Amino acid sequence: VRSDEPDRPSRRKVLRLSLGLLVLPGLTLPGIARAAPLRVVTLFQGASDTAVALGVTPCGVVDSWSEKPMYRYLRPALAAVPHVGLETQPSLEDIVLLKPDLIVASRFRHQRIAPLLEQIAPLVMLEEVFEFKRTLAMMGAALNRQQQAMALLGQWQQRVTTLREQLKARFAGRWPITVSVLDVREDHIRSYLPASFAGSVLSELGFDWTPAAREAQGVSLKLSSKESLPVVDADLFFIFQRGDSKAAQNTYEKLVQHPFWKQLRAPQDGQVWRVDAVAWSLSGGILGANLMLDEISKVALGTRSS
């Protein structure tokens, strides 16, 4: 597609996508041509995930946060795709060389370089990197794949409805139970909140949250010491570690042996579930969210916790 053709979107056009926009069949976002762009660069993990879900292979992606250079679950689709650097610092030179028809970025990561990105190609600017439904809807519209996006959202809603009923049956008389999502790192533990990627999925499934989680702002709480553990006390824990760090593993081993840990409800009831860090914290897209549902379904089925 040539830049001087009438159906080519303005290279200076930035789509600042409004919150909660409903994508309907036939909708084309302002400034984006009706013909699906052939070459798309995705500058955050959730956008790369979403492109694959929509059946689009980007011409450029950013490095993954772990399992480098690309998350294992996306490698079959993206193994041959060129990389343009880090999500926090993509290479403008590499992006230019790829000659994209569209760039998908986020205000959270890329607001400062947006004027430069829009000189390269039309720019779809999402607000956040982890709001997977919004990313799916907006990319579906920008890529002229609204029907695929709506189908994926419909399948998601059906899965959530079914799993919610299974969880209600599994915890009959106790539902909704409280939940905490714990990220064990090298030098501290982080508890994810309802506003996080994982938190939004758990809330949609009907899980309840601890008072501290409901009152806190942001996406996570940092627990600087084991003495803070009572703050996250809940009926069920989902817990993961970032990467294969020996230091993080040591932190985990010390955690589960600590007297305060053993006094918490989830450990006492055998409701501590080890889950995948990529799916729960680093993926940010509809495919990663579905991987979360796969793991949560083990809880609903009563598969043995760890």
Describe the residue ranges of each PLM region.
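Short helix-initiation/N-cap motifs at beta->coil->alpha
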Residues: V84-L92, A216-S225
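Ligand-binding pocket segment of bilobal, Venus flytrap-like solute-binding proteins
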Residues: Q217-K246
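Structured C-terminal subdomain patch of bacterial secreted/periplasmic proteins
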Residues: L38, L236-S306
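Proline-aspartate-enriched helix->loop->beta-strand connector
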Residues: K99-I103, A234
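A short, structured surface patch at a secondary-structure boundary
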Residues: S48-L97
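Basic- and aromatic-lined ligand-binding clefts that recognize polyanionic substrates
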Residues: R39-L54, L152-A212
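N-terminal secretory signal peptides
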Residues: V1-K13, G20-L27, G31-R34
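Extracytoplasmic substrate-binding proteins
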Residues: I113-D187, Q271, A279-S306
